[in-house]
Amino acid sequence: MDPKLLDILVCPLCKSPLLYRKPENELICKADRLAFPIRDGIPIMLEDEARRLPVEEEISR
């Protein structure tokens, strides 16, 4: 994932910064506990495509 792109992408719902999880190939919004997938190098920033993170799943930087 391009670091410059990561600097400008925010959560489409709350506008919070996103964390990049390389192993899962996801962008994480801590505030909304959503994981947005990255497919073929393209972040899919749609709420319907995001995975809800369970409360027990730790979100770390």
From Swiss-Prot:
Annotated GO CC locations: cytosol
Gene3D superfamilies in the record: 2.20.25.10
Family (UniProt): Belongs to the UPF0434 family.
Protein name per UniProt: UPF0434 protein Nmul_A1027
Organism for this UniProt entry: Nitrosospira multiformis (strain ATCC 25196 / NCIMB 11849 / C 71)
